[in-house]
Every structure is written in structure tokens, then in C-alpha cells.
Amino acid sequence: MANSLRLYLACIKNTLEAAMCLQNFPCQEVERHNKPEVELKTSPELLLNPVLICRNEAEKCLIETSINSLRISLKVKQADELENILTKKFLRFLSMRAEAFQVLRRKPVQGYDISFLITNYHCEEMQKQKLIDFIIQFMEDIEKEIRDLKESVNTRGRLVATEFLKQFM
């Protein structure tokens, strides 16, 4: 793993540890309901300042926190057209299975590739450290999977080109 990626993930992990102090807070508009304030944005006093962590221009993480919820939005690096296509397809595949992840949002925040929504219920049901580790591991795995897919496509392309050019020899 590259040193810049390690530092980027460590920064995100430390920020998540500090931001994941969520508590139960009932909705002020609808009685006996608990809505994530980071999504509704009805009361500005319940929202904290968002934190933007950038590895470079193409890769960044936005962490938005409120009293009862936390939203993490990720922009995955897409260096070329092939990575762009692979990333879009892979993340669309994951978004279609959002129920299996529990904290994954079906639609990402505009300008980002994928988003997670963690509420105080998730922190009560699951361990906070396990949630943080899941998100960090998810980020590592996405980068690794896209790199492997790109390598596989390039290898397959070379093999096809070699077989095609053998016809002319």
C-alpha cells in the first residue's frame, strides 16, 4: 500500500473516531420518529461542520456529522477512462445491494461516488470501532479491486491483440 494511501486512511480513521459520538435525538417535527439530521438538515444547531479530507484532486472523503447521524461520502480515484468505467460499474453493483451493507446509501451525495449513512442505532447495534474498520477496509478493497480489474482487462486486451496479429504472420 502506498504511503500516501496509508496516511489518507489514517486521517479518515482518526476523524471518524472523533466524529462517531452519536446519540439518540428524536425528530423535532414528527413525534416518536427518529430521522437522521444529517440528511434532513432541518435544524442548523444540530449539524456540525463538515470535514473534507483530500488525498489529491480526484480522491476525497467528505464527513458530515450531526447529533444523531454521520454521512461519509467518498470520491474514488479515476485516473483514466478505463478506471472511470470500472469504478462506475463496480460502485453501481455495490449500490444495488445496499441493504446487505446496512450503512451504505443507495444514492451517493452529488459529486461523490459512494456514501455511507451511520445513525446512532448503528452505533448501538454494532461496535463503533468495527464500523470504522469496515469503512477503512472497504476503501482499501475498492482501490485494490479496481486495480485488479484494470490489470485483468489490460491482460485480456493484450492476449486478444496478440491472437489477432498472429493471423497476419
Curated annotation (Swiss-Prot):
Tissue-specificity statement: Expressed at low levels in all tissues with a relatively highest expression in inflorescences.
Major localization class: cytoplasm
GO cellular component, one term: Arp2/3 protein complex
Domain of life: Eukaryota
Subcellular locations according to the entry: Cytoplasm, Cytoskeleton; Cell projection
Single GO BP term: Arp2/3 complex-mediated actin nucleation
GO molecular function: actin binding
Phenotype of null mutants: Distorted trichomes and altered epidermal cell types.
Keywords: Actin-binding, Cell projection, Cytoplasm, Cytoskeleton
InterPro entries: ARPC2/4, ARPC4
Protein family per UniProt: Belongs to the ARPC4 family.
Subunit and interaction comment: Component of the Arp2/3 complex composed of ARP2, ARP3, ARPC1/p41-ARC, ARPC2/p34-ARC, ARPC3/p21-ARC, ARPC4/p20-ARC and ARPC5/p16-ARC. Interacts with ARPC2A and ARP3.
Annotated PANTHER family: ACTIN-RELATED PROTEIN 2_3 COMPLEX SUBUNIT 4, ARP2/3 COMPLEX 20 KD SUBUNIT
Annotated function: Functions as actin-binding component of the Arp2/3 complex which is involved in regulation of actin polymerization and together with an activating nucleation-promoting factor (NPF) mediates the formation of branched actin networks. Seems to contact the mother actin filament. Arp2/3 complex plays a critical role in the control of cell morphogenesis via the modulation of cell polarity development.
Protein name (database record): Actin-related protein 2/3 complex subunit 4
Organism: Arabidopsis thaliana (Mouse-ear cress)
